[in-house]
Amino acid sequence: MILRAVAAFLLVLVVIPLGMGKALITGESGRLSFVGGYFASLFIFEILQLVFHVTMGSLRLMTLLWCLICGAIAFFGFWRYRKKGKGNKPRATVIYMSRAEWILLTLAVAMIVLQILNTVLNTYYGNWDDETYCSNAVTAWYTDTICRYSPHSGMKLGLFYNTRYVVAGWPIYSAMLAVLSGIHPAIVYRTILPVFEIPAAYVISGSLLDHFFFHDRKKTLLGLIYFQIFALLAFEKIGGNTNEWWLIVNCWTG
């Protein structure tokens, strides 16, 4: 069970994005290639989940089809990278950081870890949006369909019965990961994915800041810490019905 879960998450969140990035994005940094590959895999997933919603197709069949399509593209990317890289391996570069930069990096990482621990161990979900998204993931898993049954009554529903919640694919993405890993979709959605979502959000934000500050590492790290503080303040002002990290976790959902 544990090995299956680890293999499933590594495949979906690491191996496939790496391979698809190498296949679809050339001449860019490894980080940008990985992010591009991951979003390409999400693009294919979004198309498939809408098609299977309309046709009332099987969640498990959609999962298999997604794995085959993305796996084939990733395999091609690794094959092309290996073929192109023979005899032309780049030298490893050593990155030197000042003491101030190390301190800023440590603070940024510590705040990320704090937010992950709070989300995984201490988050109370008390809002309609999150409850509906999570129940969509669970209902899809049990009914083997894509948002075609009410998570409240169990009744069969028509196409796009509630567009706001049906079009959002992240709950179904959680259900797909549940199919692959064997872990209940509510656990995937609320406990496991935030461990990925929070660092990913900050990696993307840090990349944007790095570009904005013309690769000035110190300014980039300072900007990232200010962004983390802003997220913390927004969380404190959210209204009292939940202690979720809205700007970091909930943005993935809808």
What is each PLM-predicted segment?
Residues 1-97:
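Membrane-embedded, hydrophobic transmembrane alpha-helices
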Residues 6, 35-39, 105-108, 222-226:
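Hydrophobic alpha-helical transmembrane segments
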Residues 37-50, 227-237, 254:
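Hydrophobic membrane-spanning alpha-helices of multi-pass integral membrane proteins
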Residues 43-53, 110-118, 178:
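Hydrophobic alpha-helical transmembrane segments and adjacent interfacial helices
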Residues 59-64, 245-252:
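Non-cytosolic membrane-interface motifs at loop->transmembrane helix junctions
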Residues 64-81, 106-116, 229-233:
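Hydrophobic core of alpha-helical transmembrane segments in multi-pass integral membrane proteins
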Residues 97-110, 120:
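Loop-to-transmembrane boundary segments
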Residues 113-250:
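Active-site lumenal/periplasmic loops and adjacent helix-entry segments of GT-C-fold
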